[in-house]
Amino acid sequence: MKILILGAGKMGSFFCDLLSFDHEVAIYDPDPKRLRFTFNAHRFASLDEVDAFSPRLVINAATVKYTIEAFTNVMTHLPADAILSDIASVKTGLPEYYAACGHPYVSTHPMFGPTFASLSNLRNENAIIISEGDDLGKAFFRDIYQRLELNIVEYTFAAHDETIAYSLSIPFAATLAFAGVMKHQAAPGTTFKRHEQIARGLMSEDDYLVSEILFNPNTPGQLGRIVESLNELRTIVRNRDSAAMSAYLARVRENIR
């Protein structure tokens, strides 16, 4: 299959490496310097080169801020039956775009962002496939993710956003709360160092990505749960209530089983 990848960042390069030995792959990035380390693939410096390539599948790996713009820019260079696909962690605007674009589409969310996951060993990672997509496109990505030994779940666009509010917004907010009051320690403990490492990883992410994940309409409710839990903990600590602390810790242990 002829596959065009938009964006030569970490995830675009990952999919290029993954697919280029089984498919004819081309990769485009508006910054040609980012194409220097791609191999076994056509490297396009201009979208005009896409016309002759005539891809059957387009994988949009542009940063989340430019996902829809990247589709819009390439649209006139694609055959009418080309399948559009995105791997964005934030799906805002995509259901409406796909409904109006006239192309078959598939939307997935590989939940192994390059900041924390080892892209050479993804056995314990997860991927979401959006159920509204094209059957052929869904089958293609399901096969890829199965070969990577990922745990695969299928959600609607709406259920995806609810899940992301829980699985990303809560840890993002908790990490920001920690980093917001963090001070440099000359001799930090193990727990502090681990939290600091996570905070540094999160802060290396694109500001727009972090913002859009936190701006998920479902996030305020999840933040409210964090605030309630912290208020409860603060009351327990302030009152030095050993029985309440034991009950609180027992509940937390039950949550992480």
What positions do the PLM features span?
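Structural motif
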Residues: 2, 56-57, 83
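Rossmann-like NAD(P)-binding element
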Residues: 48-75
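NAD(P)+-binding Rossmann beta1-loop-alpha1 motif at the extreme N-terminus of oxidoreductases
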Residues: 1-44, 49
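A generic structural motif
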Residues: 22-26, 80, 150-151
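An accessory alpha-helical subdomain
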Residues: 154-257
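Rossmann-fold dinucleotide-binding core
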Residues: 90, 94, 98-151, 155, ...
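ADP-ribose/adenylate-binding Rossmann-like module
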Residues: 78-94
